[in-house]
Amino acid sequence: MPDSQSPNGSLFSRGMMAVIVAQFLSAFGDNALLFATLALLKQQFYPEWSQPVLQMVFVCAYILLAPFVGQVADSFSKGRVMMVANGLKLLGAVVIVFGGNPFVGYTLVGVGAAAYSPAKYGILGEITTGDRLVKANGLMESSTIAAILIGSMAGGMLADWHVGAALGVCALAYAGAVGANLLIPKLGAARPGQSWRFGPMTRSFFTACRTLWHNDETRFSLVGTSMFWGAGVTLRFLLVLWVPVALGITDNATPTYLNAMVAVGIVAGAGAAAKLVTLERVSRCMPAGILIGIAVIFFSLQQAALPAYLLLLLIGFFGGFFVVPLNALLQERGKRSVGAGNAIAVQNLGENTAMLLMLGLYSLAVKLSLPVVGIGVGFGAIFALAIAGLWLWRRKQ
């Protein structure tokens, strides 16, 4: 790796660009691999119920490893942690490519993703500071969403042509991410010398949880980002049922296109937040959170494709504007109190727990045969009220 660099360097320094490129390739691989592996399961006649298990093992890896991955990120150079994590993803993809059990391979990818996340966000606070950190987060989120959009489409399209080729492209993407990690400046460990025994590590993690929860700013950020990502994954599944009911379209492509509009909107919103919101004025993002819920209500009531596409673009814009400043706030304040890696690990625990809870409630609503339009309206209203409540809570602190 190159020598260490000052955290006050340019936003477009070689180190920052290496982080962004590595993140794009890694996220591209994650999303392309999901759809390529789903195609493999169909090709090998796995039962349909097995498909969501892929996402479950991915999320569960984040939750189970949450007490440990933050310390790993803070105990070593974060660039090296990212490289090893992408190496685990590469290994998982290779297992699937060469005919191994796809669930074992995808579990390895999930473990790599869980280890990668605290390092990728924590390193931003080490190679840039202050308001540049908000802009760096904007670049990171834009890169991630672009990779999600392109990777998902590429995975599905390539799998339709040749499943093996699709899986091979995923492995190449991870290999490229490992290569990009080599260009990240070698930084010192943020918090070296911590105990590696199970008891102290778990106590350290839950101490970090308590520390962040008892701080007004980090608690505010944790709750806000967890609500956002929990709602985001729920909206993705809501679209699958909403499209045939509201638009009368029964193909598989339309929900994907609608999801793409959300992704494009998030990229634009993240860019706007980087320019308009600072850490000192982070509450400026809160109206956007409320508007997400209101826009979901209007979207759920649509019966034509064009306004649906436009509203989802708007929902994505509000989402990007809302979540980027909250991420930056947590990284900046968390770095000072518990270390950036531990802060992001705690954030991952909150976000993935919120995903499981919200999806569970959504599944219950579907099982109770509630109308999907009603579910969408209720979901949007509850989200808007929850963000409004969070904003009021923040103002009272």
Swiss-Prot record:
GO terms for cellular component: plasma membrane. Keywords: Cell inner membrane, Cell membrane, Lipid transport, Membrane, Transmembrane, Transmembrane helix, Transport. The chain crosses the membrane at residues 16-36, 53-73, 91-111, 139-159, 164-184, 229-249, 257-277, 282-302, 304-324, 344-364, 372-392. The keyword Phosphoprotein does not apply. CDD domains: MFS_MefA_like. Pfam families: MFS_1 (PF07690). It is found in: Cell inner membrane. It comes from the Bacteria. GO terms for molecular function: lysophospholipid:sodium symporter activity. The keyword Cell inner membrane applies. It is a multi-pass membrane protein. Belongs to the major facilitator superfamily. LplT (TC 2.A.1.42) family. Catalyzes the facilitated diffusion of 2-acyl-glycero-3-phosphoethanolamine (2-acyl-GPE) into the cell. This is Lysophospholipid transporter LplT. The gene is lplT.
